UniProtKB/Swiss-Prot annotation:
Keyword Secreted attached: yes
Annotated protein name in UniProt: U1-poneritoxin-Na3a
UniProt xrefs under InterPro entries: Poneritoxin
Family note: Belongs to the ponericin-G family.
Species per Swiss-Prot/TrEMBL record: Neoponera apicalis (Ant)
Source organism, top-level taxon: Eukaryota
Entry keywords, A to Z: Antibiotic, Antimicrobial, Secreted
Tissue occurrence: Expressed by the venom gland.
An individual GO BP term: defense response to bacterium
GO cellular component: extracellular region
Origin organism lineage: Eukaryota, Metazoa, Ecdysozoa, Arthropoda, Hexapoda
Length: 27
């Protein structure tokens, strides 16, 4: 359900978030 999706999104952001922020700042 929605909570499972939120858990997946949260863990994905923890992995990908820093890299995405770095990429955004470099532009």
């Amino acid at each position: 359900g929605f909570k499972d999706w939120m858990k997946k999104a949260g863990s994905w952001l923890k992995k990908k978030g820093p890299a995405l922020i770095k990429a955004a700042m470099q532009e």
